[in-house]
């Protein structure tokens, strides 16, 4: 059912739902548009509405080929909406869900486009604060780039900042998506342009590997890894690309490249990446407690199916019940800033090291079962050896038919007087 948005726009059909609201296919005076209608609880917040109006000039002035332009901001009764250019295509999360990972050339081309858009935004004083695959749109009607990549555009500018008002989120709250949060955000520092670079480098890692460098498991563990762990190398990519990733994933914001520098460096690497196949690495599973039940031990006779599709994980949702395969899931929300002792890494650390395809993961059910079998085999061998020694000793000392009395040892009882 169509609904009016202000006096100039009509929303016809829902395109998707996100954490801050619903995106509609709409119509305006100049043709089709995308209309992001914010949630009712946000629209009823007068402080947010005031901030919404204040951001109007900055958002409307952000015009770049790799940014989804905001055409208008509408405040009408209970409606609070951003009217944006309509991009005919899909988002990067949908492509990742379909392909799992991209060839390095295509991945770098997509991220270089997004870095170009971020450079324009940062020059205008706008920090995105929620860079992730869900917020990168691929224009299927645009010309193909390196590696067959479609032009990439960054969307949802201003939404994170609008939600993060002083009244709605105190200084003890984190706003964002756990897998892509820069360490300084986890530690409660104000977001600067460098947080977007860290998030974009995380996206690049995910495009190459099929998983994020610090994701997996409980959101609290994810946040701790961002602060305490170093990124583990990805096998199979050129050292120049890896060093670029490491620099942009640096814990210190000042050590990261600026968006314009990142874009230029990535485009310089494109020729050496031409023709490279997607990486062949397995996703490390989330950590399991050592006393966790072992599925293989619980039902040793159960048949193992090899036809079941591999489960893939995208961003870790903070909202209970969100389905990993749902690209519209609510991942952009708030969470308490962890205390310093909660951010301290354990003795073993929590980083998830990529493995070569088919290699067993230490701590996995399969690896634990193999370890258990080796221990049983070693134990059985030890028992057999002890038994053999015992039999040999008996034959040597007490195996004759008229053998004498038992020999006195330290552990035998003294003879009665």
UniProtKB/Swiss-Prot annotation:
Residues 294-308, 349-368 have a biased composition (Low complexity). Residues 279-371, 395-417 are annotated as: Disordered. The active site is at 130 (proton acceptor). Residues 280-293 have a biased composition (Acidic residues). One of its GO terms (molecular function) is protein serine/threonine kinase activity. InterPro entries: Kinase-like_dom_sf, Prot_kinase_dom, Ser/Thr_kinase_AS. Pfam families: Pkinase. Autophosphorylated mainly at Thr. Residues 408-417 have a biased composition (Polar residues). It catalyses: L-seryl-[protein] + ATP = O-phospho-L-seryl-[protein] + ADP + H(+); L-threonyl-[protein] + ATP = O-phospho-L-threonyl-[protein] + ADP + H(+). Residues 9-270 form the Protein kinase domain. Keywords: ATP-binding, Kinase, Nucleotide-binding, Phosphoprotein, Serine/threonine-protein kinase, Transferase. ATP binds at residues 15-23, 36. Its EC number is 2.7.11.1. It is an enzyme of class 2 (transferase). The keyword ATP-binding applies. Transmembrane segments: none annotated. Belongs to the protein kinase superfamily. Ser/Thr protein kinase family. PANTHER family: MITOGEN-ACTIVATED PROTEIN KINASE KINASE KINASE 20-RELATED (PTHR43289), SERINE_THREONINE-PROTEIN KINASE NEKL-3 (PTHR43289:SF6). This is Serine/threonine-protein kinase PkaB. It comes from Streptomyces coelicolor (strain ATCC BAA-471 / A3(2) / M145). The gene is pkaB.
């Amino acid at each position: 059912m169509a609904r009016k948005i202000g006096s100039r726009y009509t929303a016809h059909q829902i395109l998707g739902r996100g954490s801050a609201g619903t995106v509609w296919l709409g119509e305006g005076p100049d043709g089709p548009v995308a209309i992001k209608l914010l949630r009712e609880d946000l629209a009823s917040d007068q402080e947010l509405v005031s901030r919404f109006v204040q951001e109007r000039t900055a958002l409307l002035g952000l015009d770049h080929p790799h940014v989804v332009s905001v055409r208008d901001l509408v405040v009408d009764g209970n409606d609070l909406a951003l009217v944006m250019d309509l991009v005919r295509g899909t988002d990067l999360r949908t492509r990742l869900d379909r392909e799992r990972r991209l060839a390095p050339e295509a991945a770098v081309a997509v991220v270089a486009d997004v870095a170009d858009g971020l450079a324009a935004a940062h020059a205008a004083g706008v920090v995105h604060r929620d860079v992730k695959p869900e917020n990168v749109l691929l224009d299927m009607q645009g010309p193909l780039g390196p590696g067959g990549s479609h032009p990439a555009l960054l969307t949802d500018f201003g939404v994170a900042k609008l939600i993060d008002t002083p009244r709605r989120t105190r200084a003890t709250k984190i706003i964002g998506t756990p897998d892509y949060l820069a360490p300084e955000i986890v530690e409660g520092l104000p977001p600067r342009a460098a947080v977007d670079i860290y998030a974009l480098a995380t996206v690049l890692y995910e495009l190459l590997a099929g998983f994020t460098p610090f994701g997996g498991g409980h959101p609290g563990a994810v946040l701790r890894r961002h602060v305490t762990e170093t990124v583990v190398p990805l096998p199979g990519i050129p050292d120049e690309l890896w060093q670029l990733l490491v620099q942009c994933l640096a814990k210190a914001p000042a050590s990261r490249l600026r968006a314009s520098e990142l874009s230029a460096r990535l485009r310089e690497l494109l020729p050496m990446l031409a023709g490279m196949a997607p990486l062949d690495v397995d996703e490390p599973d989330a950590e399991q407690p050592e006393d966790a039940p072992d599925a293989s031990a619980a039902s040793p006779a159960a048949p193992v199916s090899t036809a079941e599709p591999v489960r893939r994980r995208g961003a870790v949702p903070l909202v209970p019940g969100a389905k990993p395969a749902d690209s519209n899931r609510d991942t952009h929300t708030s969470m308490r800033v962890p205390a310093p002792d909660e951010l301290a890494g354990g003795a073993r650390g929590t980083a998830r090291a990529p493995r070569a395809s088919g290699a067993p993961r230490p701590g996995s059910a399969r690896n634990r079962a193999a370890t258990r079998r080796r221990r049983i085999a070693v134990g059985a061998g030890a028992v057999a050896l002890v038994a053999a020694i015992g039999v040999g000793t008996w034959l040597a000392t007490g195996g004759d038919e008229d053998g004498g009395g038992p020999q006195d040892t330290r552990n035998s009882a003294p003879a009665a007087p």
